[in-house]
Curated annotation (Swiss-Prot):
Pfam families the record matches: Fer4_8, LUD_dom, LutB_C
Gene: lutB
Residue sites binding [4Fe-4S] cluster 1 per the record: 313, 316, 319, 373
HAMAP family with a match to the protein in the record: LutB
UniProt protein name: Lactate utilization protein B
Top-rank taxon: Bacteria
Gene3D superfamilies: Alpha-helical ferredoxin (1.10.1060.10), NagB/RpiA/CoA transferase-like (3.40.50.10420)
Amino acid sequence: MPMKIENGPFWKRVEENLQNDFMRGAVAGMQDRGYVRRLGVIEELGHWEEWRSLAEQIRKHTLENLDYYLMQLSENVAKRGGHVFFAQTAEEANDYIRRIALEKQAKKIVKSKSMVTEEINLNPVLEAIGCDVVETDLGEYILQIDDHDPPSHIVGPALHKNKEQIRDVFHRKLGYNKSSDPVELARHARETLRRDYLTADIGITGCNFAIAESGSITLVTNEGNADLVTSLPKTQITVMGMERIVPTFKEMEVLVSMLTRSAVGQKLTSYITVLTGPREQGDADGPEEFHLVIVDNGRSSILGTEFQPVLQCIRCAACVNVCPVYRHIGGHSYGSIYSGPIGAVLSPLLGGYDDYKELPYASSLCAACTEVCPVKIPLHELLIKHRQIIVEREGKAPVAEKLAMKAFRLGTASPSLYRFGTKLAPSAFAPFAEDGRITKGPGPLKAWTESRVFPAPNNERFRDWFRNRQKGGNPS
């Protein structure tokens, strides 16, 4: 599955990103500011835990009845004149969209922000048939013209770039010669993108929530680009993960309120757009043709398992914004378009353990992610479940860990070996110990002891201490 954004060993990626001082500072600043903003809007709303419980109930109910609501959605889209395609795989979704582009002889395609099109790697498929695909979300646009630099955050994809870097990208790619002032940069991007909107043949969007009762899609943005993507081109294609659905407008209102507060610390974003099918007679704008592509791509295999709660996710990135591990290593270290705690849970499920077996270990298990999740996904518990599967079912535990556990099992199963080992341990670790602590551990202990205290084995074994105490010796 084409979800990977970085190759190379996980720990190598981590080491590289730990050297990126700007990125680490930007992430820390984003997390700190976001925490304060989020706290303010949830306190203003009041009864936040009750809202979380309601949102969780909505998502659980929808997933438990997903087949019913997807069928209802499909029927209502068709009633409004739209077309629905259920894609089992990324390849099926890409092929369907590619056929539409060929049929329409599309030369230019404009896109609003969409994680699922990143997930299925749609853009290269369309570019291969000669389409000029333009990302219109400002962050995604910056990354695209910078030689397709991958996103590092679910909500703020260009978080890892500073304004000087963005100015240099604009200079190289767009002939921009003004300052690095964000207002000037945004104005230049807006003027450039305006021409693309007006000449686009197809508009492609993601979907925050599809509404089953009406066949509508909901788009939540702060830039307004999605409105132009859906209003000006003659053909609109919306791509959604199969779980991004709600039964009615009532549930949509609850989840949008949770999404905006959790994602960007706002009561509402600047634009919340609800679209229903193609343009009807008398409408001033809108597409003449509407296609809804509903993507499975591994999601159905998660339903009914212990990992089903991860499909409750509304892509707010609240978990990312409080994660201490993400704070230090950034998004690119994860090697997946889905980073942070949600990425560490979701990526192995969609992409497999071969590529993402390290991600469940990229966590302190502090449970901050679980505490802030607006739909109550038990993220830290799911990370532990992944670790269990990696060791017990997949057999993908590190070699050093396997050997250590085997030695421990042999030693503790044999009384004579255990006695010998406890006698030998103090002298064996003495070269690595200082003041009762192992400060320069050998082998697998090296990384641990560089940042954590590891007590050295005591010279007196417990059984000897206990025997002396029974005889009336010094208990200390």
